[in-house]
Design a protein with these regions (language model features):
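Glycine-rich beta-alpha junction loops
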Residues: 46, 94, 133
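C-terminal long alpha-helix characteristic of the crotonase
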Residues: 3-8, 59-107, 114-120, 136-159
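A generic structural signal for solvent-exposed, polar alpha-helical segments
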Residues: 23, 33, 47, 108, ...
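Flexible, glycine/charged-enriched surface loops at secondary-structure junctions
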Residues: 126
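Crotonase-fold acyl-CoA enzyme core
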Residues: 1-87, 118-119, 123
Length: 160
């Protein structure tokens, strides 16, 4: 998910300096814009504002600059409140769909559905629907301990 302010400036600056987009920018732009638009965008070294980026499909939403952080946090909360395991599996299915046939895609999502249908979040979603209330997903994740580690986490010092 990508949100931009109306005043945002976006572009690929590498060619301006005689460099190639070695971080994969060309691949990302081709995926989002198609070959012709990505070629135009990068070869002509275009810099676009938030509205134009939205029209091109580079961002999903454009908001006023003063609302950008509030909207970003609102989106983050919306995603965090969703059924995490099902969302992770759906995201993977969406990413795979471009390279699968129709039948393969149906088989792939059916395999994931066989798992998610038996998670507590599915029961909570169905119960919330029956009770006409907002579901409270991920409650079953609370209280679970992290897997054991041999020694401190990489960001902790051994003396803590």
């Amino acid at each position: 998910f990508r949100i931009a302010s109306r005043s945002a400036k976006m572009g690929s600056a590498t060619l301006r300096f005689g460099l190639l987009p070695d971080e994969g920018g060309q691949w990302l732009l081709v995926q989002h814009l198609g070959v012709a638009k990505a070629t135009d965008f990068m070869m002509r070294k275009r810099i676009v504002d938030g509205e134009t980026a939205h029209q091109l499909g580079l961002v999903h939403e454009v908001v006023d600059e003063e609302d950008l952080m509030d909207e970003a946090f609102k989106l983050a909360r919306e995603l965090a409140e969703g059924p995490q395991v099902a969302m992770r599996m759906l995201k993977r299915s969406i990413l795979l769909a471009a390279d699968l046939t129709w039948d393969q895609s149906l088989d792939e999502i059916a395999a994931k559905t066989a798992v998610t249908d038996h998670l507590p979040d599915a029961r909570e979603g169905a119960q919330a629907f029956i009770e006409k209330r907002k579901p409270q997903f991920n409650g079953w994740l609370e209280g679970r301990s992290d897997p054991p580690m041999d020694g401190p986490a990489p960001w902790e010092s051994a003396s803590e």
